[in-house]
């Protein structure tokens, strides 16, 4: 059973085994670059405890998603703002002076929102807010922080890697007052990570402010938003330093659901069979209470048999 694309809420929950990654730095102190950390609370025997673990922010993942969306939109002749084409994801705001060439300056309310999303698919999918126009467009896509799964917290680790930027003696003599040759340490992390989020397909290509209006090629925009999500999650197309710190990644599990109303999958953690039972019972209850079709759930499992053969096939819920 599949749902109509124009009435769909996509939820995902993915678990990655990631080794030696430097996807998200937060600061440098001298020649030492730190990996992002986040506090994680988990139950240890009979009590709760807190520990700090490696993490990748939802903002970092959303940036990767939006750039994947830009690439697809350009290939499919969908509108992209000139800044977004350069990888600069600055959304509309008060006293906006950076979006040159916009035709939305004199518009207000729903007309202003419609004008903006007509000009830029990124702001259509990922939202914006302009207080001067009293217009707020909530993002249609959401990503959690990527953190170690609760059952694998103790197996996550951060360690520093020593590097040298080399310069020969001739260059060092020529540039004595500059730091031509340098030593530096960069933290890398390894963990079994979980990531969750959603894509509100139904709200892509139409205004959230009343009166509700739709753009042209709404279906094409919905498809681009879905395809960008598939690329981001299955091909691990997000994060920093991918050219020299490209992590070793395995998808351990990927669950994707499609529903008429907002239904969000829990993080993939613990015993996988118990997790599947929980998802199945929850979808049954969800459909019964709201008197709607049961959410469609497709899932890929590395060590067990899922109901699809590859992570990409999980997106056949579309």
Curated annotation (Swiss-Prot):
Keywords: Antiviral defense. It comes from the Archaea. One of its GO terms (biological process) is defense response to virus. Part of the aCascade ribonucleoprotein complex, minimally composed of Csa2 and Cas5a, which binds crRNA. Other possible components of aCascade in strain P1 are Cas6b (SSO1437) and Csa5 (SSO1443), while SSO1399, Cas5b (SSO1400) and SSO1401 have sometimes been seen weakly associated. Csa2 is probably the major RNA-binding subunit. The Csa2-Cas5a-crRNA complex also binds target DNA homologous to crRNA, probably forming an R-loop. Purified aCascade forms a filament about 6 nm in width. PANTHER family: CRISPR-ASSOCIATED PROTEIN CAS7_CST2_DEVR (PTHR37459:SF1), PTHR37459. NCBIfam families: cas_MJ0381, DevR_archaea. This is CRISPR-associated protein Cas7/Csa2 1. It comes from Saccharolobus solfataricus (strain ATCC 35092 / DSM 1617 / JCM 11322 / P2) (Sulfolobus solfataricus).
């Amino acid at each position: 059973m599949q749902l109509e694309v124009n009435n769909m809420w996509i939820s995902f929950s993915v678990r990655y085994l990631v080794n030696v990654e430097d996807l998200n730095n937060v600061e440098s102190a001298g020649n030492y670059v730190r990996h992002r950390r986040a506090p994680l609370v988990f139950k240890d025997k009979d009590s709760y405890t807190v520990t700090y673990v490696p993490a990748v922010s939802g903002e970092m993942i959303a940036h990767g998603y939006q750039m994947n969306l830009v690439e697809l939109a350009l290939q499919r002749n969908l509108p992209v703002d000139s800044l977004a084409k350069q990888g600069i994801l600055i959304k509309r705001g008060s006293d906006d002076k950076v979006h040159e060439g916009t035709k939305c300056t004199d518009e207000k309310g729903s007309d202003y929102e419609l004008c903006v999303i007509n000009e830029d698919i990124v702001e259509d999918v990922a939202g914006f807010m302009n207080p001067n126009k009293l217009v707020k467009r909530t993002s249609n896509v959401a990503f959690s922080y990527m953190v170690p799964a609760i059952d694998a917290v103790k197996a996550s680790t951060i360690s520093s890697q020593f590097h040298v930027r080399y310069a020969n003696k001739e260059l060092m003599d020529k540039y004595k007052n500059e730091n031509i040759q340098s030593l530096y340490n960069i933290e890398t992390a390894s963990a079994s990570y979980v990531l969750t989020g959603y894509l509100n397909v139904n709200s892509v290509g139409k205004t959230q402010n009343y009166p509700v209006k739709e753009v042209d090629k709404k279906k094409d925009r919905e498809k681009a938003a879905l395809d960008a999500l598939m690329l981001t999650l299955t091909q691990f197309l997000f994060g920093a330093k991918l050219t020299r710190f490209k992590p070793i990644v395995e998808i351990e599990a990927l669950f994707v659901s499609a529903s008429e109303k907002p239904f969000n999958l829990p993080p993939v953690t613990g015993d996988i069979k118990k997790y599947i039972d929980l998802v199945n019972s929850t979808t049954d209850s969800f459909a019964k209470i709201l008197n709607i079709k049961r959410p469609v759930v497709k899932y890929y499992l590395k060590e067990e048999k899922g109901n699809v053969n590859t992570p990409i096939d999980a997106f056949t819920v579309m």
